[in-house]
Amino acid sequence: MVDLKTKAFDIAQNFTISLDGPAASGKGTIGLILAKKFALKYFQSSIVYRQLAFNCIHQQIDITDIDAVIALSQELKLDNNIDLENEDIGDIASKIAVISEVRNNLNHNLINLVKTTPRIIMEGRDIGTVVAPDADLKIFITASPYVRAVRRYNQLQAKGKTCILDEIIQQIILRDKRDKERKVGPLLPALGAFIIDTSKLSAIEVVEEVTNYIKNKIT
């Protein structure tokens, strides 16, 4: 059996990391740094839900029409030329993500991607519990709602987008509630996950903690 340290640092080995956590916990930044450090393909699973949300808006589909949303999820194709980093799109994505059939349809594609990619880090809400339960390393990161809201606020401000901090805080609290209470793939740490609170840590510090965990993990 190949140990975790060898899988991580030997690029000839297959290596899968699941990176889960709530909205704006720092998953994206941390995931990209880890991907570069360990020569992994990085994939953000929320993109498929945001793409579906965008398609619902573009095709004027009422998201309360469950059958229509499910049908649209069966033929989803990603468009890399679209800016999906929008709070309205994110809010709709969170709402349609609670639909069991939608999650099953989109997760099928995500599972195939994990299985066919030798070295990958996939980031989301239920990667370690549903999409890649056999991942070599399962990470769950979190932070307080206020800290996460400030991070999201700063991200949007940097992009020149108008936003109100209090509204972002409420959106994050509501999104957390939906994520934790949905029937399929609720937000929770996977069994055996390395759990990190990033409230007082920079992305680099989190990566250092993950690296030390890998080096010292006894399998």
From Swiss-Prot:
Please name the Gene3D superfamilies in this protein's record: P-loop containing nucleotide triphosphate hydrolases
Q: Where in the cell is it found?
A: Cytoplasm
Give this protein's Gene Ontology molecular function annotations.
ATP binding; CMP kinase activity; dCMP kinase activity
Lineage, top-rank taxon, reads Bacteria
Name the GO terms of the biological process aspect: pyrimidine nucleotide metabolic process
Q: What is its EC number?
A: 2.7.4.25
Name one cellular component (GO) term. cytoplasm
From which residue to which does any coiled coil extend? Answer: none
Sites binding ATP sit at G21, P22, A23, A24, S25, G26, K27, G28, T29
Write out the catalysed reaction. Answer: CMP + ATP = CDP + ADP; dCMP + ATP = dCDP + ADP
Q: Which Pfam families match?
A: Cytidylate_kin
Entry keyword set: ATP-binding, Cytoplasm, Kinase, Nucleotide-binding, Transferase
Q: Which family does it belong to?
A: Belongs to the cytidylate kinase family. Type 1 subfamily.
Q: What is this protein called?
A: Cytidylate kinase
Taxonomy of origin reads: Bacteria, Pseudomonadati, Pseudomonadota, Alphaproteobacteria, Rickettsiales
Gene name? cmk
